[in-house]
A protein has these predicted regions:
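Extended acidic, Ser/Thr- and Pro-enriched interaction/regulatory segments
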Residues: 1-263
Length: 263
């Protein structure tokens, strides 16, 4: 994953390996992380990828729930601790969380405290005085998402995600889950067949823009997580994945001239 805003000097690079299990809920465990860099302050932040559950399957009322406790660590010396505690079988509200911001030298001295429901609203307080500094409403007009500017589907490369998953997206938007699953399976089956054909020819499939690096070379992660229980798990993710800027600079359509996502 790569996100960047050259105008504001913000960049994020991350990757994940997802493990799924089922025990009445769909459990998604994410192995990986994201590094956020802010040019203005020359700061790096290590962001965790939280575990997510899809609950309500038995009641046919699906909703997501983030679970567990996490830390965001920065090169500035400041950190945050976030604990998600959603609805249980007996009591509790959906999507609840509590968080605090502190300096790593004084983890018990909270500079800010945040609590609320991440899908609705939360309150930010001064950690020393308890004064409410801000109330954030997710659905407030001023907090709406920025408008996305996308090329028309017909102008996109067959490997761009919205075109590759066009049929699946359309069926999901129409509420046709069975048709969406069939469309999803068609793309996945085509990709598995391509991998088998490449293996038979002695070829190795390579990502278009990302390259894998040894975990020992990921110095930012090693520096920021030193002294914590955070592990890289680079063996399970087949290395640390980063965008290759040179490949991005030379990218031209068609991205893979000899293949589409379906053949």
């Amino acid at each position: 994953m790569h996100l960047s805003d050259d105008k504001h000097g913000v960049r994020a690079d991350g990757y994940a390996c997802v493990e799924m299990t089922f025990n009445g809920s769909v459990n998604n465990r994410q192995i990986g992380h994201t590094i956020l860099h802010i040019n203005r302050f020359d700061e790096d932040y290590v962001l965790p990828l939280p575990d997510v559950q899809v609950r309500g399957l038995l009641a046919a009322c699906f909703y997501p729930e983030i679970t567990g406790s996490y830390r965001i660590v920065s090169s500035s010396g400041y950190s945050s601790r976030i604990t998600f505690s959603g609805a249980g079988l007996v009591r509790g509200a959906r999507n609840r969380f509590e968080a605090s911001v502190f300096h790593q030298k004084a983890p018990e001295t909270h500079l800010y405290e945040i609590s609320g429901v991440w899908s609705e609203s939360w309150v930010i307080k001064d950690g020393k005085t308890g004064e409410i500094l801000e109330i954030y409403q997710v659905d407030a007009p001023e907090n709406g998402p920025a408008q996305m500017e996308l090329e028309p589907i017909e102008n996109q490369d067959p490997w761009e995600s919205r075109r590759a998953w066009k049929d699946t997206i359309e069926q999901l938007q129409a509420g046709n889950l069975r048709a969406a699953a069939a469309a999803k399976h068609e793309v996945e089956a085509a990709q598995r067949l391509l991998r088998e054909q490449e293996k038979d020819r002695g070829e190795e499939w390579r990502p278009l823009l990302f390259q894998s690096h040894p975990g020992a070379s990921h110095q930012v992660f090693q520096d920021l997580t030193r002294g914590t229980q955070w592990t890289l798990s680079d063996i399970r993710t087949k290395g640390v994945w980063r965008l290759d800027n040179n490949l991005l600079a030379g990218l031209q359509k068609p991205y893979r001239p000899t293949h589409t996502s379906m053949q």
